[in-house]
Amino acid sequence: MGIPGLLPQLKRIQKQVSLKKYMYQTLAIDGYAWLHRASCACAFELVMNKPTNKYLQFFIKRLQLLKRLKIKPYIVFDGDSLFVKNHTETRRRKKRLENEMIAKKLWSAGNRYNAMEYFQKSVDITPEMAKCIIDYCKLHSIPYIVAPFEADPQMVYLEKMGLIQGIISEDSDLLVFGCKTLITKLNDQGKALEISKDDFSALPENFPLGELSEQQFRNLVCLAGCDYTSGIWKVGVVTAMKIVKRYSEMKDILIQIERTEKLCFSKAFKQQVEFANYAFQYQRVFCPLSNQITTLNNIPKAVTNSHAEIIKIMKCIGSVVERGSGVRKDVINTKNIDHKVHEMIAKGELHPVDMASKLINRERKLKARKLFKVGLLGGESNSFNKKVEQPLVDTQDVLSERENSLDNKNASSIYMTSPAAISGTVPSIF
């Protein structure tokens, strides 16, 4: 995640802040980043497919912090992956599987302390886990959205639309997408580091990011390596800065690199750069105002009028469900997109990967599976049917008295109170 080495170069403009600074404002939250952080406490359960509410507990604790500070959260979850990111996702998936094998071997050998380290490295954050948080958000009227694809451009889009005033995330990629205010390293006391795009001009001469155009900034991260490119061997962000300051066009940069023996790049790099430029600028996002799929920035007519360019850009911004056919296709005209389907995805009702099946809460799914096994192993079918009609989890096992304080009538009214909370009953989120 992020651009290797970028944040250290921005140290001069990183400000120690308290979230009190954002009182009465709305901040976007990178949902998967919080899920990754939360998974450390329940990695064994997640990898071994056992029920757990620990990742929900983490969210509740953080949301209580924001509520005390009178900050309104807007949680953004990742959707489907992009073709342009396949190499990154494949590498990560392979590494997770390797770590899972090591973890299980260590666990079987009785070395459980070291096994936990590898369990944490093998956790795969899933839409079903996000659904658990979504159900909680619905219960407490907390704004959220599932991005059609990546959360980063979705959060930047919300910022561009004025729906949020900052983004809480650990991902420096957000700056390349155009994030104006990035809040990182948030701790349990509400302290964090703030990086503002307006402060780029205050960076030192050896890293004058404020002097670069947006295209040069994209060239820099492509050379140094990002989620969309493998980068150039031995080129970090500092060396990349020197290169882009000398040559403004990527084609000139690559020509010069080909002439030198010190640097080299893979055959696929040129195409990776082209795809990265499209992905950073025109990714699909969901507009919560119009309830329609759109793009982070408007795609130029020069691109939409070229069949060859349309084929390229679709690999970078994602295919969508076509209106009428209900089939997932490379649709460029927004009028031909089934926006109702994508609205259901954005609300967490449909699975963001297959864009068709119902998205089910992870814990609810595990409970249903357990009840199904009980029904198969014994008991009358009628009694089994009666069982599954009951709540799948006793919410008192999930929500402690401290957590239920979110519904306390004396608490800040920053959140709307649900009818269930007013009546004193809390419906099951699992």
From Swiss-Prot:
Name used for this protein in its record: DNA damage-inducible protein DIN7
Residues at which Mg(2+) 2 binds: D171, D173, D227
One of the record's GO molecular function terms: 5'-3' DNA exonuclease activity
Family: Belongs to the XPG/RAD2 endonuclease family.
Source organism (scientific name): Saccharomyces cerevisiae (strain ATCC 204508 / S288c)
Description of what induces expression: By UV light, methyl methane-sulfonate (MMS) or hydroxyurea (HU), and during meiosis.
Residues that hold Mg(2+) 1 according to the record: D30, D78, E150, D152
Record region (I-domain): 114-247
Cofactor: Mg(2+)
UniProt cross-references to CDD domains, sorted A to Z: PIN_EXO1
Predominant localisation class: nucleus
Name of the top EC class for this enzyme: hydrolase
Region: N-domain, residue numbers: 1-96
SMART domains: HhH2, XPGI, XPGN
S-adenosyl-L-methionine recorded as keyword: no
Entry EC no(s): 3.1.-.-
Pfam families xref list: XPG_I, XPG_N
Gene Ontology BP terms: DNA double-strand break processing; DNA repair
Function comment: 5'->3' double-stranded DNA exonuclease.
Any one cellular-component term (Gene Ontology): mitochondrion
Keywords linked to the UniProt accession: DNA damage, DNA repair, Endonuclease, Hydrolase, Magnesium, Metal-binding, Nuclease, Nucleus
PANTHER family recorded: DNA DAMAGE-INDUCIBLE PROTEIN DIN7-RELATED (PTHR11081:SF65), FLAP ENDONUCLEASE FAMILY MEMBER (PTHR11081)
Subcellular location: Nucleus
Cofactor binding, note field: Binds 2 magnesium ions per subunit. They probably participate in the reaction catalyzed by the enzyme. May bind an additional third magnesium ion after substrate binding.
